[in-house]
């Protein structure tokens, strides 16, 4: 009983603190709910399970393309309800995700959908440490694994550069140092060249003269706004066309 007394006193003290600060308690409850969901389905396999089940297999001659990524992919076309209108493109982005999470869901969210090509945009959240510290080598290994899985299933691969960030609106470069983004992009480009994959360079097209994401292309210094997606869309189309031609 004596051993339990300090624990009980601490719990009483915490209860008093939470009673005095209900907003903090609410945030804690939300965080616990988020953590519970993460622990029960860390790669978020459930996000697209129902949609995948409803999606019919590609028809004859259909050149389905899956976009695998994080929030930048997830938000693409969501505001206007249009994601490459008229094209058989499937959005499988999940906000906040890192490459190990994407690798775990690569089979149900890409391979099982029988696409002709996959566009992979990933790495910024790994650099930020969203799911824990990650070295560049670990990120590269996960990207390599996704590319190899795709090729083993006769899926053409488009590897995208990590997007630049900026501090013009909110501080973003502390968690995502530009030097790390440049280093990872250098590896992605070289890997794509060495393995005859298509490299999709969003980075260069969205960079200003300060080596930052152009202010007019973002609302928070990290995610593209409508103007940003307008820059990205034709680049993605060109890369997909190149991949499907096998060049």
Please state what every model-predicted region is.
Residues 72-73, 97:
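Short active-site-proximal "capping" loops at secondary-structure junctions
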Residues 81-88, 97, 101-247:
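Alpha-helical cap/lid subdomain in secreted, periplasmic
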């Amino acid at each position: 009983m004596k051993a339990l007394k300090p624990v009980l006193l601490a719990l009483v003290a915490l209860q008093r603190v939470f009673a005095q600060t209900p907003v903090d308690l609410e945030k804690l409850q939300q965080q616990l709910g988020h953590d519970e969901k993460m622990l029960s389905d860390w790669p978020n396999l459930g996000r697209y399970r129902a949609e995948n089940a409803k999606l019919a297999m590609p028809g004859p001659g259909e050149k389905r393309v899956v976009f695998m990524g994080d929030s930048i992919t997830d938000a693409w076309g969501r505001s206007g309800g249009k994601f490459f209108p008229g094209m058989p493109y499937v959005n499988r982005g999940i906000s906040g995700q890192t490459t190990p999470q994407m690798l775990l869901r690569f089979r149900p969210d890409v391979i099982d959908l029988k696409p002709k090509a996959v566009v992979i945009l990933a790495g910024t959240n790994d650099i930020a440490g969203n799911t824990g510290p990650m070295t560049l080598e670990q990120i590269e290994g996960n990207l390599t694994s996704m590319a190899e899985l795709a090729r083993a299933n006769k899926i053409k691969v488009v590897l995208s550069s990590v997007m630049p960030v900026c501090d013009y609106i909110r501080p973003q470069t502390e968690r995502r140092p530009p030097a790390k983004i440049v280093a990872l992009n250098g590896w992605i480009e070289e890997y794509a060249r060495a393995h005859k994959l298509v490299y999709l360079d969003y980075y260069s097209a969205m960079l200003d003269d300060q080596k930052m994401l152009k202010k007019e292309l973002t609302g928070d210094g990290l995610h593209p706004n409508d103007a940003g997606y307008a820059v990205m869309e034709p680049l993605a189309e060109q890369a997909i066309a190149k991949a499907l031609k096998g060049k």
